[in-house]
């Protein structure tokens, strides 16, 4: 994250523990700035990890966003999305859309009831996130994810 922040020229801060995170989010609210809180992935079967994610989602002005991989099994993705949603995830990011020929996980996430925020169509962090629109989702499903010219008149 620090390398990405440097690449896109935005400030980076590291919060140690819940108290540090609370202070950082309060400072961001006071300055009317957006903070991106990146956490390590976790096993949804781990009660302590589930409680930590849920607590994070309860912080004032925090929008918890779940991240799932397009390379996962569709049924597993649906279960994961359901669990993340029950813990407070309000939207989803689906990564690795460019890495799989089978897009069942993307379809499962898109039809789960939890809104898709973004997808990734590149292995490079600097390529950023693609906002999900009906057109971008259709392009991803037909295999031209991230191709700005796909479907355009020639």
What kind of region is each of these model predictions?
Residues 5-52, 57, 69-70:
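Switch II (G3) loop of P-loop NTPases
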Residues 21-22, 77, 102-103:
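Short, well-ordered alpha-helical microsegments
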Residues 42-47, 60-77, 99-100:
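Conserved Switch II/interswitch segment of TRAFAC-class P-loop GTPases
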Residues 48-50, 78-79, 104-107:
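Short amphipathic alpha-helical segments
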Residues 57-60, 79-84:
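Structured C-terminal portions of repeat-based eukaryotic scaffold domains
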Residues 61-68, 85-126:
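Conserved beta-strand/loop subsegment of P-loop NTPase cores
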Residues 110-154:
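NTP-binding/hydrolysis catalytic cores, primarily Walker-type P-loop NTPases
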């Amino acid at each position: 994250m620090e390398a990405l922040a440097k690449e896109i020229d935005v400030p980076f801060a590291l919060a140690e523990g819940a108290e540090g995170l609370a202070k950082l989010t309060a400072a961001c609210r006071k300055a009317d700035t957006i903070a991106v809180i990146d956490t390590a992935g976790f096993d949804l079967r781990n009660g302590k990890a589930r409680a930590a994610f849920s607590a994070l989602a309860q912080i004032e002005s925090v929008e918890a966003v779940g991240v799932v991989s397009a390379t996962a099994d569709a049924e597993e993705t649906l279960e994961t999305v359901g669990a993340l949603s029950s813990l407070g995830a309000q939207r989803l990011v689906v990564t690795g859309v460019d890495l799989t020929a089978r897009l069942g996980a993307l379809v499962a996430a898109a039809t789960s009831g939890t809104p898709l925020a973004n997808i990734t169509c590149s292995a490079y962090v600097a390529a950023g996130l693609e906002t999900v629109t009906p057109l971008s989702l259709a392009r991803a499903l037909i295999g031209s994810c991230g191709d700005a010219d796909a479907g355009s008149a020639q």
